[in-house]
């Protein structure tokens, strides 16, 4: 038997590629409620989502689950691949862009019931109202336009409406490249909405990891049918979310996530400043 821990990501639990005595392989993720009280429910949700995805979806297949004594473990098909290189390589980014397009096509209309992306923006993927009420110190530009940012993010729930099942957490550490194909992994946050929302949420992490600027990434993605004001509303909500959550204490077992959110928040904020032309 052999187990090799896999680096990356923000889960406080085990993530390992495992080879059993009979030579079979799988990828195992497991967590105890003592490590983080919220993560076991995320593993359960991921099992529900992945087990219901159609065979055409480019995902690692769920093989088994274990849920007992405060521990939840999931066994997935072992994908012999790698996460995208950092800094981003142009060929791998193009592969991801094409793969995410295909995934959206396969998952439209949604094959499963799930919460709406708009509900997420209405309840927690936002932050400007929180930052305003807390009187938190802000970037000069954000402070100048704080009321407008509050109003703009309030439009995001309606803007996000759609009938595609979105991964809703697309980042380099949530994908594997193997055999010139991209496999999208880690599905607990899946929601139903408009595909453009996925691209907007993905873009700040690409630039943070030394890929193209968000607007350059959007030029790789045909979003001609989406109004600029709708795009700006979602970017505003994402920026507010990242910046507000970055000020909170880190969740148990995930000490680095707030710095990750802060970096993406600053990128999203600068992106929004450039798009709005507000000075």
Locate the predicted segments by residue.
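Active-site activation/catalytic loop segments of kinase-like enzymes and analogous catalytic loops
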Residues: 196-226, 235-253, 267
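Active-site acidic catalytic loop and adjacent metal/ATP-binding pocket
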Residues: 9-19, 27-28, 152-197
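A conserved alpha-helical element in kinase catalytic cores
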Residues: 26-68, 86-102, 197, 206
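Conserved short submotifs of the Hanks-type protein kinase catalytic core
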Residues: 69-82
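Regulatory N- and C-terminal appendages and interdomain linkers associated
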Residues: 1, 263-279
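An alpha-helical support segment within catalytic cores of ATP-dependent transferases
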Residues: 108-167, 222
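Short, flexible/disordered intra-domain loops and linkers
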Residues: 34-41, 249-259
């Amino acid at each position: 038997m052999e187990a090799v821990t896999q680096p990356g990501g923000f889960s406080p639990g085990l993530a390992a590629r495992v080879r059993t005595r009979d030579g079979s392989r799988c990828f195992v993720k497991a967590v105890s409620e003592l490590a983080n009280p919220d993560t076991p429910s995320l593993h359960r949700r991921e099992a529900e989502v992945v087990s219901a995805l159609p065979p055409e979806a480019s995902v690692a297949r769920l093989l088994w689950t274990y849920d007992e004594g405060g521990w939840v473990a999931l066994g997935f098909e072992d994908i012999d691949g790698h996460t995208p290189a950092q800094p981003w390589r142009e060929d791998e980014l193009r592969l991801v862009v094409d793969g995410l397009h295909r995934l959206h096509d396969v998952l439209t209309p949604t094959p499963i019931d799930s919460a709406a992306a708009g509900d997420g923006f209405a309840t927690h993927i936002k932050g400007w109202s929180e930052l305003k009420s807390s009187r938190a110190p802000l970037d000069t530009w954000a402070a100048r336009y704080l009321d407008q940012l509050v109003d703009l993010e309030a439009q995001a729930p309606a803007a996000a409406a759609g009938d595609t099942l979105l991964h809703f957490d697309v980042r380099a550490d949530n994908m594997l490249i193997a055999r010139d194909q991209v496999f999208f992994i880690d599905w607990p946050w899946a929601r139903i909405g408009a595909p453009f929302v996925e691209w907007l949420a993905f873009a700040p992490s690409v630039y943070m990891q030394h890929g193209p600027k968000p607007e350059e990434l959007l030029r790789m993605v045909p979003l001609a049918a989406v109004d600029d004001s709708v795009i700006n509303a979602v970017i505003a909500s994402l920026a507010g979310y990242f910046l507000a959550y970055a000020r909170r204490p880190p969740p148990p077992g995930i000490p680095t996530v707030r710095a990750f959110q802060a970096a993406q928040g600053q990128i999203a904020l600068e992106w929004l400043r450039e798009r709005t032309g507000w000075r």
